[in-house]
């Protein structure tokens, strides 16, 4: 199975990726840290789950090379599940992408992040 971590820039995707895979991918408190997809494996179940950390996007209409990477993965590689990481401090901006992801007919889980800052 393959799960994709998708969300706006600087929403906590790579932090969740590191927690799930045991990786040490670079994180930063600014957008644009992840510029290409990263892949890791969640091994705590009998079945391996491949986790893909995608660069941050605001919509499925890309404006930068990083956004093209994310959009192409979501549309062409068809993950089994999308985990949409949402920054709770800016729900309106984040939910625009969520509405687009829901239209892909891929199962989606919403992970509300940064709730302690609200």
Feature map (PLM): residue ranges:
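Conserved G1/Walker A P-loop phosphate-binding module
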Residues: 1-65, 75-77, 81, 103
């Amino acid at each position: 199975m393959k799960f994709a971590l998708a969300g706006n820039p600087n929403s906590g995707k790579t932090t969740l990726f590191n927690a799930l895979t045991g990786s040490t991918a670079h994180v930063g408190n600014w957008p644009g840290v992840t510029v290409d997809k990263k892949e890791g494996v969640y091994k705590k179940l009998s079945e391996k789950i491949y986790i893909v950390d995608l660069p941050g996007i605001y919509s499925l209409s890309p404006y930068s090379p990083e956004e093209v990477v994310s959009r192409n993965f979501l549309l062409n590689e068809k993950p089994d599940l999308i985990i949409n990481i949402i920054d709770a401090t800016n729900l309106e901006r984040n939910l625009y992408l969520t509405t687009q992801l829901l239209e892909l007919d891929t199962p989606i889980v919403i992970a509300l992040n940064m709730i302690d800052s609200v």
